[in-house]
UniProtKB/Swiss-Prot annotation:
It comes from the Archaea. Residues 1-35 form the signal peptide. Keywords: Signal. GO terms for molecular function: structural molecule activity. This is Uncharacterized protein AF_1051. One of its GO terms (biological process) is archaeal or bacterial-type flagellum-dependent cell motility.
Length: 161
C-alpha cells in the first residue's frame, strides 16, 4: 500500500508541474505578444515621424484669374519623399475680403499635374514642380493658399484678388 501512495504522489506532482508550466507558458506567450505589438507600434510611429522629416514642399507662385475664377499655383517637392498621386493632397484658401469679412474654403475642385517631370512618370519625385489649378470664386481681398501633403507637411503663399 505504501507503494501505491507514493505513485499517486508522483503522478500528482507531475500533473501539478505540467499545469504550472502550461500557465507560465501562457503568460509568457501573452507577454511576448504584447511586447511585439508595442515594438511594432513604436516602429510605425518612428516611420511616420521620419516621413514627416523627409517631406517638404515650397509654393513657388500663386495667381488668380478674375474672369475664370481660377487659382493657379506652382509648387516644388523640396523634400526626399515621393508621392505616387495627388489624391491625398489638400488645398485650403483663407483670407479677408476687401469688405473685412474673414473667409476660408477647403478647395474640392483641384486639378494637380506635374509640370517639370524629371524621372518616374506620374510620380511627384523630389525636385519636381507641380501645378495646382482650382476654380474658386473669390471677392476682392487678400488671401492665403495652403497646400498640404498626405504627411501633413504644408506650405502657404499670399495672393490678392
Amino acid at each position: 500500500m505504501v507503494m501505491a501512495m507514493g505513485f499517486d504522489t508522483v503522478v500528482a506532482a507531475i500533473m501539478a508541474t505540467a499545469i504550472i508550466v502550461a500557465v507560465a507558458y501562457t503568460f509568457l506567450a501573452g507577454s511576448t505578444s504584447i511586447a511585439e505589438l508595442s515594438v511594432e507600434s513604436y516602429k510605425d510611429a518612428v516611420n511616420s515621424a521620419v516621413k514627416k522629416l523627409r517631406s517638404d514642399i515650397e509654393i513657388l507662385s500663386v495667381s488668380y484669374d478674375n474672369s475664370t475664377s481660377k487659382i493657379v499655383a506652382y509648387f516644388k517637392n523640396t523634400g526626399d519623399e515621393r508621392y505616387p498621386d495627388f489624391s491625398e493632397f489638400d488645398a485650403i484658401v483663407y483670407g479677408r475680403t476687401s469688405g473685412g469679412e474673414m473667409v476660408s474654403f477647403y478647395v474640392n475642385s483641384t486639378v494637380f499635374s506635374i509640370t517639370n517631370e524629371l524621372i518616374n512618370p506620374g510620380i511627384f519625385d523630389p525636385q519636381e514642380v507641380a501645378k495646382l489649378e482650382a476654380v474658386q470664386p473669390l471677392q476682392n481681398g487678400t488671401y492665403v493658399l495652403l497646400i498640404c501633403t498626405p504627411n501633413a507637411v504644408c506650405d502657404s503663399a499670399d495672393f490678392s484678388v
